[in-house]
Amino acid sequence: VWVGVIPNETLLGLSKFNRLVQWIGARPQIQEETVEQIADEIPVAFIENYDMHTGLMMTSGVDVWLNNPIRPMEASGTSGMKAAMNGVPNCSILDGWWPEACIHGVNGWAIGNAEDDRDDDRDAENIYKVLENDVLPLWEEDGDGWSNMMKASIAASA
């Protein structure tokens, strides 16, 4: 799921978004038929017109808040904070608020190290490692552990 606002519809923001769309096999213009064409191959959803209501629904209605900002570009991470307040564990690159709040494996998960410089390939590898080795086993095999993680997420946001 790709959610966000292209800041002031800047050319740079549009360029990056268009590159993402091209990367997933669609053309630069997001159209319904384009999404349908790639849906069988790559499950992608783009939520347009992201606003406070949409943010509220997402931060209170997901099982894990996966956040992978480019270090050090995360201003604060308020959506992750809101998710934690709703008992949603964060799984995030250590940027914004998360380096101060994260206790890996207790209230969420860290992706990589805070000291790391930008390395998209390494970050992608670390995302999959954390999801496969930490997040999914807890979710699938330890309901009590998951509940404790949710409670610790709420406590971290207090």
Task: Pin down the residues of each PLM region.
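Catalytic binding pocket for nucleotide-activated donors in carbohydrate/polymer assembly enzymes
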Residues: 57-157
